[in-house]
Amino acid sequence: MTALGLVLLSMMGYSQHMQQANLGDGVATARLLSRSDWGARLPKSVEHFQGPAPYVIIHHSYMPAVCYSTPDCMKSMRDMQDFHQLERGWNDIGYSFGIGGDGMIYTGRGFNVIGAHAPKYNDKSVGIVLIGDWRTELPPKQMLDAAKNLIAFGVFKGYIDPAYKLLGHRQVRDTECPGGRLFAEISSWPHFTHINDTEGVSSTTAPVVPHVHPQAAAPQKPHQSPPAAPKV
């Protein structure tokens, strides 16, 4: 990844230890917060897939809105987990990682854990949600940098395939996610890929619905969810 350089992801109690990765010239930093740091509830169950992941899928949360302080971003992660576990009946928060407006990386399900964020891709991808509504506004630079650094680190540690394909959520289901402005941004990133309808089909995954608060006043293009929410 160009211009990232030395990526230093400070590990705070995370079992998948993040270390220094020599990726070129220049220095970028990001901090990873563990599940215990943001007060995550225990998952109902954890299912792993064999890495490295061939896909990275970018999301926006839409709701909750962008957070700029770490306490607010921690609450946003808890709110998303509550919605996914308690309302949808899923095993855990749907995403692999969250990115806050504070520039922090928040551990969701983590690497090599089957997610609940993208149909057909849950068992072969890293799902990264940038907290906020990015339909018309671009996320702050620190959020974009954190996402890039996380991807670069995942490649360096072998969690993400070096030839990974970068996708926006809208490419794998009928949704505005990750928002038009953010989608335009990631379209310029290395590894962004245009896909066809037959890629990534898996019989082990099921359609999922992104985190949208039930009282959101300006809904995204709606998803057609199954009668019973999948527990993934």
From Swiss-Prot:
The reaction(s) this protein catalyses: Hydrolyzes the link between N-acetylmuramoyl residues and L-amino acid residues in certain cell-wall glycopeptides
Annotated phenotype, changing residue 175 to K: Loss of function
EC primary class: hydrolase
- Report residues carrying sugar chains: 196
Name listed for the protein in its UniProt record: Peptidoglycan-recognition protein LB
Q: How does it assemble?
A: Monomer.
The ranges of region (Disordered) come to 213-232
* Cross-referenced SUPFAM superfamilies: N-acetylmuramoyl-L-alanine amidase-like
**Which cofactor is essential here?**
Zn(2+)
Signal sequence extent = 1-15
Q: Where is this site: Essential for zinc hydrate coordination?
A: 95
- What Gene Ontology cellular component terms go with this record? extracellular region
In short, the EC number is: 3.5.1.28
Q: What function does the entry list?
A: N-acetylmuramyl-L-alanine amidase involved in innate immunity by degrading bacterial peptidoglycans (PGN). Probably plays a scavenger role by digesting biologically active PGN into biologically inactive fragments. Has no direct bacteriolytic activity.
UniProt-listed Pfam families = Amidase_2
Ordered alphabetically, the record's keywords are: Disulfide bond, Glycoprotein, Hydrolase, Immunity, Innate immunity, Metal-binding, Secreted, Signal, Zinc
* Binding-site residues for Zn(2+), renumbered to this chain: 59, 169, 177
What do we know about what induces or represses this protein's expression? Strongly up-regulated by PGN from B.subtilis. Regulated by the imd/Relish pathway.
What species was this sequence derived from?
A: Drosophila melanogaster (Fruit fly)
Give disulfide pairs as residue numbers.
67-73
